[in-house]
């Protein structure tokens, strides 16, 4: 982790930790680094979730990018993994997401994907941080026709839905599913995708107002979904977080399927089809021992990394593995995506359910979780840096 960039970019309370001034500096620094590395005027995509502060930060970030000569294509409200996919499809030089994922609405963040669809390498983030530290003093500002342009891109959701539809495949006809979109970025994609795949869908958390993202809904608040599934007689429930890079689920009895369980089910299906590269699933040190023991019993190897999907992805890419993720619901399916994708994960899980002929509770019962206690500690950027320095 760098001084400003954590495992998921720059994050903090919008207007306090993450100010407009900071967003503009990030934009200027990123545009300068990309111009230097590509040798041309960079094209940069920007997507965001539904937070009230998103428009403010996008305006400041865009001003910073354009002031150094980068062209910006605004995607509007789209899931984080959509930006990672579209930056490759549209052959852009980078993609930026303005989101704080599963966090409350007062938080926001800025995460940058390279033109490859992967998060920026550490050394590139360090270059941007160096520019931030000196207030971008050494970066010349563009003038005249050198100033960047801003365009609104309206085809992003359509192209992303098409990608998901082709990647998921299969027929979900006969499934009755309750889907919680966390009042976040997943709503429009979900409403187009899952009915098209054949599922009968009821949606929760699809009325964002800028303030209600993740508020009692989504993957960090499963109670309402679990209750709705049981009372409504649904086959299962699906929950995304605010930017849809996470997916959790519950069975028809209202019992949770966490990221470990979803990874285990998908890894088994991939193994059966000869698609489990390296016969290995990559998880983090937070994964439950029950998951590890089950995978051993099925002849599948597991590798553990530090907490953070960034570290999971690094291990997968270095070793050629196809699936990995976190207990929290980040699942990376490297045959189809370069980052965790909640809606892709949900589609693959629902396809597995439809093809199995079983109830979701039967799939959920493949192993029992061992007793486990996880404790979250709140720390600001300075405290995190001090902790890392003391390791």
Segments the model singles out, each with a brief description of its role:
Residues 126-161, 166, 252-325, 332-333:
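Proline/glycine-rich low-complexity loops and linkers
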Residues 1-63, 67-68, 150-175, 381, ...:
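An N-terminal, well-structured beta->alpha segment
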Residues 37-43, 137-151, 174, 234-237, ...:
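Flexible, glycine/charged-enriched surface loops at secondary-structure junctions
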Residues 236, 273-391:
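Phosphate-binding and adjacent anionic-ligand microenvironments
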Residues 32, 36, 40-107, 192-250:
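N-terminal small/polar loop signature for handling phosphorylated ligands or for N-terminal nucleophile
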Residues 47-49, 179-181, 251, 335:
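Short glycine-centered, acidic/aromatic-flanked micro-motifs in structured strand/loop junctions
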Residues 13, 108-232:
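Gly/Ser/Thr-enriched, mixed-charge loops and adjacent short helices
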């Amino acid at each position: 982790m760098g001084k400003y960039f954590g495992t998921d970019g720059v994050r903090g309370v919008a207007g306090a930790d993450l100010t407009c001034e900071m967003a503009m500096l990030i934009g200027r620094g990123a545009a300068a680094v990309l111009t230097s590395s590509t040798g041309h005027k960079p094209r940069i995509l920007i997507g965001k979730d539904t937070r009230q502060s998103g428009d403010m930060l996008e305006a400041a970030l865009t001003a910073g990018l354009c002031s150094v000569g980068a062209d910006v294509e605004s995607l509007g409200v789209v899931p984080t993994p959509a930006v990672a996919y579209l930056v490759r499809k549209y052959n852009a030089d980078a993609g930026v997401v303005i989101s704080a994922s599963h966090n409350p609405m007062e938080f926001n963040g800025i995460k940058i994907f390279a033109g490859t669809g992967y998060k920026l390498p550490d050394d590139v983030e360090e270059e941007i941080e160096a520019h931030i530290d000196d207030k971008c003093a050494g970066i010349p500002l563009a003038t005249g026709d050198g100033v960047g342009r801003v365009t609104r891109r309206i085809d992003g959701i359509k192209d992303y839905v098409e990608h998901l539809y082709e990647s998921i495949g299969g027929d979900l006809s006969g499934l009755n599913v309750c889907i919680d979109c966390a009042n976040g970025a997943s709503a429009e994609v979900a409403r187009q995708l899952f009915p098209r795949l054949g599922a009968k869908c009821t949606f929760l958390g699809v009325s964002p107002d800028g303030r209600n993202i993740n508020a009692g809904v989504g993957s960090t608040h499963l109670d309402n979904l679990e209750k709705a599934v049981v009372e409504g007689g649904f086959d299962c429930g699906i929950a995304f977080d605010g930017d849809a890079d996470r997916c959790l689920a519950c069975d028809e009895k209202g019992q949770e399927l966490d990221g470990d369980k979803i990874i285990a089910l998908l890894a088994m299906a991939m193994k059966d089809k000869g698609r489990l590269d390296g016969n290995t699933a990559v998880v983090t040190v937070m994964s439950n021992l029950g998951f590890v023991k089950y995978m051993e019993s099925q002849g599948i190897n597991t590798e553990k990394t530090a907490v953070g999907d960034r570290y999971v992805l690094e291990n997968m890419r270095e070793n050629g593995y196809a699936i990995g993720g976190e207990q929290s619901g980040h699942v990376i399916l490297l045959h189809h995506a370069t980052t965790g994708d909640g809606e892709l994960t949900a589609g693959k899980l629902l396809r597995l359910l439809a093809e199995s002929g079983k109830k979701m509770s039967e799939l959920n019962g493949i192993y029992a979780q061992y007793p486990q206690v996880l404790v979250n500690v709140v720390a600001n950027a300075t405290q995190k840096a001090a902790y890392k320095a003391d390791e």
